[in-house]
C-alpha cells in the first residue's frame, strides 16, 4: 500500500500540470497514427473519448485493454490514471499489433515499460495514482492545428534501427514506440523518471540535442526527410559547417591562402581575419580599415574587377560571383596603401659586397652589422669579394662615431685601393681615436685618406702582410703630411706621430701671430699686415669708445668717433672712411637707421657698386620720379666723390646675441655683426680683412692716403687737420698726442725709414677740404680730456 500511495502522490502533483497536455498529446498521437505509412485506419475508440464526456462505467473497456497491453493494474486505484493515458494506450495497442517480437511502450513523459511476448506480463514501473478529490473526466479539446513538439530520442543504450513515420510526416508528431532487436528475449527494465526531465521531451544525448536544435531552427520537409531511418545520426560537425566557411585570398602576385569566416560576416569582418592570417607582413604595419579587397569576376561578360565595400555580405558576394564555388585561382586580392615613409636604402644589406660605392652613404646600421665578418674576410677572402665592398669606407666615417670601431676598413682597403682613389680621400678620420678598438681597421684608412698613399701601399704590402700586421697599425687614423714616411710606418707602431702633428700646426699659427702683437714693428711689416685705413667708431658709451680707441691705437690705424647716428651720417658724408663700427642702440638716430641712410646716400650718389656703370637698377628706380630725384641730388649730394671709391663697410655692434637682431642688422645693410664685449683678436682680424679688401677695391685711394701721411710728417700745418687725414707714422714734433690722431711716440718709426718711403713714393694726394678740418678739430681735445 505504501508503494501505491507514493505513486498516487506523484500522479496528483503532475496531474494539474499535464491535464491539458495529456489530452493534446493524445490527439496529436491519434492524428499521427492515422497518417502512418502502413495505411492502418485509426481505431474508432480514439475519437469518442476525446470529444465526449466519458462516464466511469464506460471506462472499463479502455482500462481492460490497457491492462492487456501491459500497462499494469493495481485494482481500482489505477482507473484514474488510465483516464489520462486512454488515447495513448490505444495508439500503443496499434503499435503492438505491428510489432513481431515484442513491444516497448514509451510514454511522452519519459517513462517506459517493456514486456516479453511469450512470457507473463510483468508489473509496470510506470503506474501513476491520481488523487481522489480530482474529478476523473477526459476534457473535450478542439485543436485547429497540431501542437509542434520537438522530436524525442530513445535512450542511448537502445538501438534505433528505424524512426517512426510520424517524424517525417509532420513536425508535430512524436515517436511513440520503438522496437527492440529481434534477438532480445530478456525483459529490460525501464529508466526511472526524473522530475527535471519531464518537460516536453526525454533525456537525449549531446549529438541528438544538436539535431533537435537544428530541426527546430530550420523546419522544413527537406530537412526532416534528410534524416533517413537507416542513416547514422548527424554529428556536431554538420552544425559547425553551417556556421563557418573558408574563402581564398592572396596578395598581389603572391600565392593564395584560406581564411575562415562566418556565414554572416561582412567584408569589414573578413579584413580582421586577414590581418590575423598575415600577422607579420600586414598586421604589424596596417589596420583593418586600411586593407581593401578586390574581386575579379569569373565571367568575361561581367564588369571588370572592383573593390568590395566594407558593408557587403562576403558569403553572398562570393556565391554571386562564383556560383559553383570559389577556386584557388579566383582568390580575392588584398590591397594595402602604399608606404609613405622612406624605405631603407637598397644598397644597405648586412654585407658590404652588395653595395656600390659610387655615391656617398648616410646609413648608420649597415657598417655595424658587417663589423664582425670583415676582420675575418681580410685574411681569408679573395680579391673579388673585396672589390665588391667598395662602399665600406664611405660608411666608416659614420660607423666610427656610432660604435668607435673600424673593423671593415682593412679588408676592403687591402685589395681595392685603385677604385677607391676618387672617393676615400673625402672621409678623413683624424678627429676620432676609435682606431685603437679593432685590429685591421687602419691599414686601409691610412691608405684611403690620401690617394697618393694607396698605390704605394699596393706595391709595398701584400694581402698576407696586411692581414698579419693589421693589429700593429691600429692607432693610425692618419693624416700624414708626407705620404712616403706614412707608408713606411704602415707596418710599424710609429704612425701615431703623424696624428700629433695637428697641434704642431696650431703652434705654427701662434708663431705667425707673435710678430703682429708687439707694438713696435718695422714699417714694411706694418704696411703688409694692417693697411692704413680710416675707421669711424659710432658709440654713445664713453667707456666702450675708449676701449675701441685703444684697440685702434694698437693696430695703428686712423679713427674718428661719433656719439649718435645722425653725427655718424654727417661725418661719413665728409668721405675717406673705409670701416664703420656702428652701435645699434644710439640716441637721436639708432644704428640701423643710420646704416640705411648711408646705404641710401651711396645708392643715390652712385658710389661703388651703386654707380651707373656697375648697376642700372638704382638709377632707373630713381629716374621714375624726376622731382624726387632732383630733391635727393640737392639734399644728399656729396662734396667730393673722389673720397668715395666704394661703399663703406659697416660692422654692427650690439650686446644682444639674438639671431633675430643679427638678421635685422644684416637686412639694414650691415656687412658684419659683432657682439660686445669686443675681442681684440677678432677685431684685429676684421680690420685686416676689411682693410685689405678696401685696399684692393680702391688701390689708388689707398696710395693717396699713404703719400698724404708722409707729407703730414714734414708739414706742421697738417697737424691741424682731422684725424682721418693723419698718417699712421707719428709726428715726433707733436708734444700732446691724442688717440684720435694716433701719433704717440711709441708708435713712431725711424727717420731713415720715413725718408726712404718718401723717396720711393711720390705724392699724388689732394689737400682735404676745410670742412673736414673744422669737424675734426674739437675731437682730439675731448678724447684727450677723457684719457687724462
UniProtKB/Swiss-Prot annotation:
Q: Give me the disulphide-bonded residues.
A: none
Q: Which UniProt keywords apply?
A: Cytoplasm, Phosphoprotein, Two-component regulatory system
UniProt subcellular location: Cytoplasm
Q: Identify the domain of life.
A: Eukaryota
Positions carrying 4-aspartylphosphate: 583
Response regulatory domain residues are 534-691
Q: Which GO terms describe its biological process?
A: phosphorelay signal transduction system
**Where does it primarily localize?**
cytoplasm
Q: Null phenotype?
A: Shows little sensitivity to high-osmolarity stress and moderate resistance to the iprodione/fludioxonil fungicides. Impairs phosphorylation of HOG1 under conditions of high-osmolarity stress and fungicide treatment.
Gene3D superfamilies the UniProt entry points to: 3.40.50.2300
Q: What does this protein do?
A: Two-domain response regulator protein in the two-component signal transduction system of the HOG1 pathway. Controls high-osmolarity adaptation and fungicide sensitivity via its regulation of the phosphorylation of HOG1.
Can you tell me which family this protein belongs to? Belongs to the SSK1 family.
Identify this protein by name.
Answer: Response regulator SSK1
Amino acid at each position: 500500500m505504501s508503494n501505491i500511495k507514493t505513486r498516487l502522490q506523484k500522479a496528483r502533483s503532475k496531474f494539474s500540470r499535464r491535464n491539458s497536455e495529456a489530452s493534446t498529446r493524445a490527439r496529436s498521437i491519434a492524428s499521427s497514427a492515422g497518417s502512418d505509412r502502413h495505411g492502418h485506419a485509426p481505431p474508432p475508440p480514439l475519437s469518442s473519448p476525446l470529444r465526449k464526456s466519458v462516464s466511469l462505467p464506460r471506462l472499463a473497456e479502455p482500462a481492460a485493454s490497457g491492462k492487456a497491453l501491459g500497462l499494469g493494474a493495481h485494482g481500482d486505484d489505477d482507473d484514474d490514471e488510465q483516464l489520462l493515458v486512454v488515447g495513448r494506450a490505444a495508439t500503443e495497442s496499434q503499435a503492438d499489433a505491428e510489432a513481431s517480437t515484442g513491444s516497448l511502450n514509451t510514454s511522452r513523459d519519459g517513462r517506459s515499460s517493456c514486456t516479453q511476448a511469450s512470457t507473463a506480463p510483468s508489473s509496470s514501473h510506470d503506474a501513476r495514482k491520481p488523487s481522489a478529490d480530482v474529478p476523473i473526466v477526459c476534457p473535450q479539446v478542439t485543436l485547429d492545428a497540431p501542437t509542434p513538439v520537438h522530436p524525442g530520442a530513445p535512450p542511448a543504450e537502445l538501438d534505433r534501427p528505424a524512426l517512426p513515420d510520424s517524424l517525417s510526416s509532420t513536425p508535430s508528431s512524436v515517436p511513440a514506440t520503438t522496437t527492440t532487436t529481434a534477438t532480445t528475449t530478456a525483459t529490460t527494465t525501464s529508466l526511472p523518471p526524473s522530475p527535471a526531465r519531464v518537460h516536453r521531451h526525454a533525456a537525449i544525448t549531446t549529438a541528438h540535442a544538436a539535431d533537435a536544435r537544428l530541426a527546430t531552427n530550420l523546419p522544413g520537409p527537406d530537412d526532416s526527410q534528410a534524416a533517413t531511418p537507416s542513416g547514422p545520426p548527424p554529428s556536431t560537425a554538420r552544425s559547425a559547417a553551417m556556421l563557418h566557411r573558408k574563402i581564398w585570398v592572396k596578395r598581389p602576385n603572391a600565392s593564395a591562402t584560406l581564411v575562415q569566416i562566418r556565414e554572416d560576416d561582412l567584408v569589414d569582418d573578413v579584413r580582421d581575419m586577414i590581418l590575423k592570417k598575415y600577422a607579420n607582413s600586414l598586421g604589424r604595419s596596417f589596420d583593418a580599415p586600411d586593407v581593401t579587397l578586390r574581386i575579379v569576376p569569373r565571367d568575361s561578360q561581367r564588369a571588370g574587377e572592383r573593390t568590395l565595400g566594407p558593408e557587403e555580405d562576403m558569403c553572398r558576394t562570393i556565391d554571386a560571383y562564383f556560383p559553383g564555388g570559389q577556386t584557388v585561382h579566383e582568390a580575392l586580392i588584398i590591397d594595402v596603401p602604399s608606404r609613405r615613409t622612406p624605405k631603407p636604402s637598397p644598397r644597405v644589406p648586412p654585407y658590404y659586397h652588395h653595395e656600390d660605392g659610387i655615391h656617398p652613404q648616410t646609413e648608420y646600421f649597415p657598417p655595424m652589422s658587417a663589423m664582425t665578418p670583415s676582420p675575418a674576410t681580410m685574411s681569408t677572402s679573395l680579391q673579388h669579394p673585396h672589390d665588391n665592398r667598395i662602399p665600406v669606407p664611405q660608411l666608416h666615417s659614420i660607423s666610427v662615431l656610432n660604435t668607435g670601431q673600424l673593423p671593415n676598413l682593412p679588408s676592403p682597403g687591402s685589395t681595392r685601393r685603385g677604385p677607391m682613389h676618387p672617393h676615400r680621400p673625402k672621409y678623413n678620420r683624424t678627429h676620432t681615436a676609435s682606431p685603437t678598438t679593432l685590429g685591421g681597421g687602419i691599414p686601409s684608412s691610412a691608405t684611403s685618406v690620401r690617394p697618393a698613399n694607396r698605390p704605394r701601399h699596393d706595391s709595398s704590402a701584400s694581402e698576407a702582410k696586411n692581414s698579419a700586421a693589421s693589429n700593429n697599425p691600429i692607432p693610425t687614423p692618419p693624416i700624414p703630411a708626407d705620404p712616403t714616411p706614412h707608408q713606411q710606418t704602415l707596418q710599424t707602431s710609429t704612425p701615431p706621430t703623424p696624428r700629433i702633428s695637428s697641434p704642431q700646426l696650431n703652434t705654427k699659427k701662434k708663431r705667425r701671430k707673435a710678430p703682429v702683437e708687439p707694438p713696435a714693428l718695422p714699417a714694411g711689416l706694418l704696411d703688409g699686415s694692417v693697411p692704413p685705413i680710416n675707421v669711424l667708431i659710432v658709440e654713445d658709451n664713453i667707456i666702450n669708445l675708449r676701449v675701441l680707441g685703444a684697440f685702434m691705437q694698437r693696430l695703428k690705424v686712423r679713427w674718428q668717433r661719433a656719439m649718435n647716428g645722425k653725427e655718424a651720417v654727417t661725418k661719413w658724408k665728409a668721405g675717406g672712411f673705409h670701416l664703420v663700427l656702428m652701435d645699434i642702440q644710439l640716441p637721436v638716430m639708432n644704428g640701423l637707421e643710420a646704416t640705411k641712410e648711408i646705404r641710401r646716400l651711396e645708392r643715390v650718389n652712385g658710389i661703388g657698386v651703386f654707380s651707373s656703370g656697375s648697376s642700372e637698377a638704382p638709377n632707373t628706380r630713381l629716374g621714375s620720379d624726376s622731382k624726387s630725384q632732383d630733391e635727393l641730388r640737392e639734399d644728399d649730394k656729396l662734396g667730393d666723390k673722389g673720397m668715395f671709391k666704394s661703399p663703406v663697410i659697416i660692422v654692427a655692434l650690439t650686446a644682444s646675441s639674438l639671431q633675430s637682431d643679427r638678421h635685422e642688422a644684416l637686412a639694414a645693410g650691415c656687412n658684419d655683426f659683432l657682439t660686445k664685449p669686443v675681442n681684440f683678436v677678432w677685431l684685429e682680424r676684421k680690420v685686416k680683412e676689411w682693410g685689405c679688401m678696401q685696399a684692393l677695391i680702391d688701390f689708388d685711394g689707398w696710395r693717396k692716403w699713404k703719400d698724404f701721411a708722409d707729407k703730414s710728417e714734414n708739414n706742421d700745418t697738417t697737424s691741424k687737420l682731422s684725424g682721418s687725414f693723419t698718417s699712421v707714422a707719428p709726428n715726433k714734433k707733436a708734444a700732446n698726442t691724442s688717440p684720435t690722431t694716433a701719433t704717440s711716440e711709441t708708435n713712431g718709426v725711424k727717420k731713415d725709414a720715413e725718408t726712404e718711403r718718401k723717396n720711393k713714393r711720390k705724392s699724388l694726394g689732394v689737400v682735404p677740404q676745410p670742412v673736414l678740418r673744422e669737424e675734426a678739430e674739437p675731437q682730439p681735445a675731448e678724447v684727450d680730456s677723457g684719457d687724462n
